[in-house]
Amino acid sequence: MVNHTATHLLHQSLKDVLGSHVNQAGSLVHPEYLRFDITHPNKISSTELDDIELIVNQKIGENITVDTSIKSLEEAKKEGATALFGEKYGDNVRVVTIGEFSKELCGGTHVSSTGKISKFKIKHDKAISSGIRRIHAITSNHVDLYLKEKSDELGLLKEAEKKKEVEKQSQSILLNSVDIDSIIEYPIMDFDGIELLFSKVELGDASDLK
């Protein structure tokens, strides 16, 4: 129910940000995520995705009542209800209305108000065919789990970078600890036409070789 209502909010937000040409081209409502396919010719920029996500979360924060009603198809269309392109409807249809924000023909189950969705996060979008893009999103506690996972990954990355920097600094200290004056050069020696130069480097401690 949560992800179904979130899909309606996403649909209208996509139209608001990308344009009225956006239409649903497919969807999947799963308990842990939602997937929404739309008609759109271009890649959706990160700024546009942020704007879309912001609108959805604003509507969630407004805790708008989700109303369902049965109306004639003609009446629903006059009220501006969004219908799926190519879908066949009977004389009477079920209309899901989310305040003044969204009105769609839909037979699915929904939450009673948008606040029950709690949170909304777009994970990514991609092109699945010419002119069709697919958006993956999550809601509620799945957003918290996703953000924690990303935070943990970032922490591991920072730790790895920190380790690299420490190793780099250690190597620099080791090189700087070698006294140039302590390098004793030996004469160049010839081995079967190959000239080799030997030298001896004196280090302060055996641990410097580790």
Predicted regions located by residue number:
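Short glycine-rich or small-residue beta-strand-to-loop segments that form or flank ligand, phosphate
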Residues: 37-39, 197-198
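Ordered, soluble secondary-structure elements with a strong preference for glycine-centered loop motifs
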Residues: 1-5, 42-50, 147-148, 203-210
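Gly/Ser/Thr-rich helix-start
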Residues: 27, 108-109, 132
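Active/ligand-binding-proximal structured segments within catalytic/core domains
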Residues: 1-38
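Non-catalytic interaction/regulatory segments
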Residues: 38-128, 137
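Short intrinsically disordered coil segments
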Residues: 5, 54, 109-110, 150-155
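Terminal appendage regions of diverse proteins
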Residues: 21, 117-210
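Generic, well-ordered alpha-helical scaffold segments in large soluble proteins
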Residues: 9-17, 51-62, 138, 142, ...
